[in-house]
Amino acid sequence: MKLLVTILVLASGLMASDEKSAKDASHYEMTTYVLGILRKGPNWGSGTKEESTRIQEGHMANIRKMAEAGKLIVAGPMGDDGDLRGIFIFEAKSPEEVRAMTEEDPAIKSGRLVLEMHPWYAAAGLRVNDPKTAK
């Protein structure tokens, strides 16, 4: 009988803990980010292979620069060859702040990519750690 009582007490404690966790998870602190959507631009696919390589290297350097500044928190390409080429998520006050950071990106500057921006509401503290630098 003691064993049955012990099991019931433990089970009720676990259920209460699960209910508390579920309630806590629904109370995230929210904040506004800027979602950037990269699409093929009017000059997509133009130029020589050398130009494309130089532009892509500059594009990646700009991504690193924005990430190191703590402004670009998520970036990545799409997995197919459609018009949608990639996404950025910025921790920035406005699309104008993002525009100032991205207007020097060679892929955007050359018209190979076009950046569309939208305010985006999500959980505060959104981060993706670089596996090379995560400790």
Segment roles from a protein language model:
Residues 17-135:
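Conserved, structured core segments of small domains
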Residues 3-12:
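Sec-dependent N-terminal signal peptides
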Residues 1-3, 60:
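Hydrophobic alpha-helical segments, especially transmembrane helices
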